[in-house]
């Protein structure tokens, strides 16, 4: 990560910690106060657009939590024997569609 990216991400974290809306102007102002001069304006606008409408504190508290994946696995196991039969039927349909799309288009590889 470059110095500009780190500076913008730290500025965004500071703004989020203070409960201030994250905008490109506020990031640029904070970088100016910290005397970080080598940040191009595109970085501040990219970070502001990427974090617009997102709760940074919520993102930080949920980093690495895999709680959402476990219920999906349990639900899939409870489906029983019907799921493999449906999966096999879906695979057969996909194979048939692939065969139709591989038709000869009038030119060969070595023509």
Curated annotation (Swiss-Prot):
The keyword Transmembrane does not apply. It comes from the Eukaryota. Keywords: Phosphoprotein, Ribonucleoprotein, Ribosomal protein. It holds the Pfam family Ribosomal_60s. InterPro entries: P1/P2_N_sf (IPR038716), Ribosomal_P1/P2 (IPR027534). Gene3D superfamilies: 1.10.10.1410. Disulfide bonds: none annotated. CDD domains: Ribosomal_P1. Signal peptide: none annotated. One of its GO terms (cellular component) is cytosolic large ribosomal subunit. The keyword Ribonucleoprotein applies. Residues 84-111 are annotated as: Disordered. Phosphorylated. One of its GO terms (molecular function) is structural constituent of ribosome. One of its GO terms (biological process) is translational elongation. HAMAP family: Ribosomal_L12_arch. P1 and P2 exist as dimers at the large ribosomal subunit. Plays an important role in the elongation step of protein synthesis. Belongs to the eukaryotic ribosomal protein P1/P2 family. This is Large ribosomal subunit protein P1. It comes from Aspergillus fumigatus (strain ATCC MYA-4609 / CBS 101355 / FGSC A1100 / Af293) (Neosartorya fumigata). The lineage of its organism: Eukaryota, Fungi, Dikarya, Ascomycota, Pezizomycotina.
